[in-house]
Amino acid sequence: MKLKNKFALLSLCGLMLSANLMAQADDVSPQRKQAIDSLALEKVRDLSKYISIIGNKKTAFSEASRVMDRAEELFAPGSEMGVSALGREAVIYFPIRKYFERLNALNYDRVTIKWYNIHYISDLERQPDGRYVGVVTIYQRFEGESDDGLKYKDTTKKDITIYVERKKTQIEGRTVEFWDVLLGDIRVTETTA
């Protein structure tokens, strides 16, 4: 098992081990919140890597499809990704899978996508339905270049909605509650050269 998968499994186990304590309390303890925040930021960083792989023109289609499947698992159902461009005021929103497919099919010979300055801009807040919602901001640097000299570059500031909710699973015949983190809509807030 790869180190990353082991870490993810250990993180999940850690979240599940505290489920009994969490089930007794309505609020998330500061220690648990810190673990949830770390998991949320890890999922955002994973998405950053997946987007770079999907957009890379050297990635085989079969590999890109596999990575799209993995990336989709990070999101809550119905989530959308905003897409902007310099010289166009409107932001267009696509369902997550459609965004990945369009990214993979961009008409450039070389594409580089880097995310940086990833941080929370709002604390997790409890919602009436019992889940918690927060927002993570990222900056995305996009560079596309064609062999015929066509070049496009922009930097986009994006806000990612983070959902944290209690879920249940069966482990050795026992029902165990745990906190899960899912990504939601990714909204464009600013696009610059």
Give the role of each language-model region:
Residues 47, 51, 75, 103, ...:
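Hydrophobic, Leu/Ile/Phe/Ala-enriched alpha-helical segments that form helix-helix packing faces
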Residues 6-10, 71, 193:
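Intrinsically disordered and other compositionally biased segments
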Residues 119-193:
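Exposed beta-sheet edge and beta->alpha loop/turn motif
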Residues 64-112:
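Short solvent-exposed beta->alpha transition segments
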Residues 23-66:
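Short, low-complexity N-terminal intrinsically disordered segments enriched in polar/charged residues
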